[in-house]
Amino acid sequence: MSKKPAALIILDGFGLRNETVGNAVALAKKPNFDRYWNQYPHQTLTASGEAVGLPEGQMGNSEVGHLNIGAGRIVYQSLTRVNVAIREGEFERNQTFLDAISNAKENNKALHLFGLLSDGGVHSHINHLFALLKLAKKEGLTKVYIHGFLDGRDVGPQTAKTYINQLNDQIKEIGVGEIASISGRYYSMDRDKRWDRVEKAYRAMAYGEGPSYRSALDVVDDSYANGIYDEFVIPSVITKENGEPVAKIQDGDSVIFYNFRPDRAIQISNTFTNKDFRDFDRGENYPKNLYFVCLTHFSETVDGYVAFKPINLDNTVGEVLSQHGLKQLRIAETEKYPHVTFFMSGGREAEFPGEERILINSPKVATYDLKPEMSAYEVKDALVKEIEADKHDAIILNFANPDMVGHSGMVEPTIKAIEAVDECLGEVVDAILAKGGHAIITADHGNADILITESGEPHTAHTTNPVPVIVTKEGITLREGGILGDLAPTLLDLLGVEKPKEMTGTSLIQK
């Protein structure tokens, strides 16, 4: 019996905008895409910012896009998750934070807050520190100390004073907190097992050892005078009038490490929490029994509490298809294979029962502008064969070209990439339609739609432009205002499968 497959076709990096200059999507001849756009119901989807769980205005990417598509819901990335928690009041009700504060209050101990002191948004955000200071004040703490790690990488190399001034203003306004130590991230956030660096940061925080200054701004001024900028500032101790350190991390104190990205938070956390730590000698009087809180899950090796626990993505599209006994195919070339498999399945490597995967090797060229068609024709040939063999109920396909060639910032090769994809798209969709099936044609984020900056330079990054969605089924209407998280419910809708409660996205097909 002939299967009537429903396919989700992702044209990676295929964004939409009206302006044609530097817009390979608009400049390319794409008769098949245009035919489907004109013949079938279509809309645009938001694929950036909070609609995909990123901060407002931030461009999407392939990992985030495929996570949202497969999950059928907005998957909040750590930064946005914490921002939303602050905005909606969940942050100050977070039990892990409250327990750390109770430990300090009930045992007359200090609360130490440490993390990267910037608004770079890659490892941390200074607003999260301010929210912790407000919470500490609200809960009546007085002994609150900040150990600031200077950035200079995710923000400008000499911006530390801006952030220290912001922090000093907040301390004054909120009425709690003192800066106890300052160190460049080169020391406190090493991830390459350069323990001599980590030890310097540790000794400043735990023992009050290192160069000493009366204020954080003095540390920076002195460093700059010696040609040492933010990232590389030597771990330094802030002292009181009598020359004693403002604070040292001591036995039984509470610590909240407000970085959200794990990789550069693990080593310094292990130094404070791991009973079997052997990478350098912490000394006899190292602080023990700390109530140590990580903002997110850093590592199994870190012996601490986690404020924002990992979100397990249950009932992604692949799992739901499998539960209903439907056969599914995931197909892409090497560059986007992890996206249609691992990310589409919510971070799961293993196949679901009834899932088949086809990997087509990407061409071995230095850069893809040298071969803009990449392996699109091979992907198409393999898929058409599968469709004709009536094996699959659902197909998830990615064409990598608009994104991978778009990253070159070169208009002509990207036009060629899109024209190759359009040719393949026509054969694939027509094969599906010939079987009585349906296709959803869409994208995960923009890229090929802006290849030239306003100043005429090559534009190699993703864009925040909307992406298309076409459903090749006549007699239906698609609603406006859709997001990537609505695609899985739409695919299930085409297959007559009810979406699970975990999928908070809704089908784009109007009822």
Curated annotation (Swiss-Prot):
Substrate binds at H123, R153, D154, R185, R191, R261, P262, D263, R264, K336. Binds 2 manganese ions per subunit. GO terms for cellular component: cytosol. The modification Phosphotyrosine is found at Y36. It is an enzyme of class 5 (isomerase). Keywords: Glycolysis, Isomerase, Manganese, Metal-binding, Phosphoprotein, Sporulation. Mn(2+) 2 binds at D12, S62, D444, H445. The modification Phosphoserine is found at S62. Its cofactor is Mn(2+). CDD domains: iPGM. Monomer. Belongs to the BPG-independent phosphoglycerate mutase family. This is 2,3-bisphosphoglycerate-independent phosphoglycerate mutase. It comes from Bacillus subtilis (strain 168).
